[in-house]
Amino acid sequence: MNKLLLTLVTIAFALALTACDDSASSGDSNGSGSNTTSKTTGSFPPNGDEGFYCDVTDGTNADGSYWKQIKVNIPKYKGHVEKFTFDQNGTGTQYYEDSFFYTTSYEKTAMCLEYEDGLKENSHKRNYTETYCGNGFYYFVISFQNLHLETLHSQVDDYEDDCKDYEKKWKDGDYDEFIEKRTWR
């Protein structure tokens, strides 16, 4: 009986690792995201960039659609990218990425399991067109239609304030504990 239980636990663990290993995930082609993400590396180097930064950029595409993006690098801890692209009819996409630096294989696996659970929980209310988890980062792309422009602008107008919050937390040392835990290994 103990051998059977051990075998079942081993198989379940192996399946969990296989489902979310560093090179696996779900999703389709990468054409609708931030156009700066590779399915194997994300928008940041494997352990992030050296210095703290938070950049907000925006522009207009050739088709007239508007885009706005926030990109945050917290050295030795986390990177984050969020980009909305939408037209005058309220049709577009949201790209969302989180990268975690100096993570163990166990932490990467746990992150992907949580990510997959979150996708399942929200799949009935969001139209995911692309998803990925592996190599210490995850992203998803959501497509939408006919959203009110005021709602969309309110989402992206907060990016500048978000940068101020990230910078204040960085200067106040709010991330120091996480950084220390990850880099002592």
Regions found by a protein language model. Give the residues of each.
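Bacterial signal peptide processing site
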Residues: D21-S23
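Positively charged n-region of N-terminal signal peptides that target proteins for export
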Residues: M1-L4
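Subset-of-secretome marker
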Residues: F44-R185
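Sec-dependent N-terminal signal peptides
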Residues: L6-A12
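C-terminal motif of bacterial Sec signal peptides marking the signal peptidase cleavage site
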Residues: A16-A19
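N-terminal, intrinsically disordered, polar/charged segments of Gram-positive cell-envelope systems
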Residues: S25-S43
